Amino acid sequence: YLSWGFSVININYRLANTALAPAAVEDSRCALYWVINNAEKYSFDTTKIVTTGFSAGGHLSLTTGIMSPETEFDKQCPSHDLDNKFDNKKVKVAAIVNWSGITDVEDLIAGDNKRNYAVEWLGNNITNTEIELAKKVSPINYVRSDLPPILTIHGDKDTVVPYAHAVKLHQKLDKAGVVNQLFSVKGASHNYFSKQQTQQIYATIKEFLIKHQLI
């Protein structure tokens, strides 16, 4: 990304062993506010913000990029203007590059694809309260027509974050008329792409960003 002319901000967020959901979502949203509020200081172009991440980072790149400025997860941000003087029109991204990200948290705690790591993130004791929170932090539930372009990269043999999550998001985005692309990595698991596959992935990302005039 640096070689493509981007300024890169690699954020830290609270993990499950430090704070349960929705802390990571809040931290990532706050990072977006920080970027926008510090754009002049660091010469960031806020019309070309791209969120990206792998696995949990893919999930957070989606939630950060597609939630509306009025979301409850912004309220704890130090830079959030509680008097509503902040220009909400600026709180948006130009594109999202999602690598193997979770799209439906509810599915991972109470659905067909239940995973222990997701249950732990919600606090292990899953009640209706946790299920409602899972819905709120699921990117699939924020799909609407005015979203930025989204590129999803996912191995079709991924069993950690089911490949079905990528397919489901792609289908729902298509139905809503959102510009998006699903790059399926054939035979790839969750945490391994071959050198050739990695080269293909980055070529696809670059082509995607050029297409949307972000490079």
Residue ranges of model-derived segments:
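Alpha/beta-hydrolase superfamily serine-hydrolase fold, recognizing
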Residues: Y1-I215
